[in-house]
């Protein structure tokens, strides 16, 4: 009986995670199960990195386009994409939107994908970025700062 009680929440979590992954594929255009994600907090902000097999030229181009697009959207204070992927307002985004003029979002290509470097000297913005990245790590089931294959 206890195993049935425990299995129900796990099934709901797995179902919720699959739904998150499906929304992520819709938003990003690539299968997150075949990609590596990082959400790294840094003293002056953080970084979001997404890479896949570098021989998949179309997938790499799609990742780079997505990261470029979110760097521009985030700079404008627009966080609809993470809201859609996670099915809710993502922690930190409200402050990041208000303090958008104090935060830089810089896209860099990487082998197999790219990264968005998030840079600020504003302490409230740094805390918000760290909240945003911590939520991303939790919801995407990324352990610490290690690269994670979904």
Q: Which residues make up each language-model segment?
A:
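Bacterial N-terminal signal peptides
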Residues: 1-7
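Intrinsically disordered, low-complexity terminal tails/loops enriched in metal-binding residues
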Residues: 12-150
């Amino acid at each position: 009986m206890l195993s049935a009680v425990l299995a129900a929440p796990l099934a709901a979590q797995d179902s919720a995670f699959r739904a998150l992954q499906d929304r992520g594929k819709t938003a990003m255009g690539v299968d997150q199960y075949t990609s590596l994600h990082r959400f790294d907090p840094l003293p002056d902000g953080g970084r979001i990195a997404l890479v896949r097999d570098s021989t998949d030229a179309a997938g790499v181009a799609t990742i780079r386009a997505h990261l470029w697009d979110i760097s521009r959207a985030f700079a404008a204070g627009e966080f609809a994409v993470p809201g859609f992927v996670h099915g809710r307002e993502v922690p930190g985004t409200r402050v990041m939107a208000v303090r958008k003029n104090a935060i830089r979002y810089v896209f860099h290509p990487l082998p197999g994908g790219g990264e968005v470097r998030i840079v600020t000297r504003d302490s409230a913005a740094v805390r918000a970025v760290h909240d945003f990245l911590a939520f991303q790590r939790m919801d995407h089931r990324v352990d610490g700062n290690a690269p994670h294959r979904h």
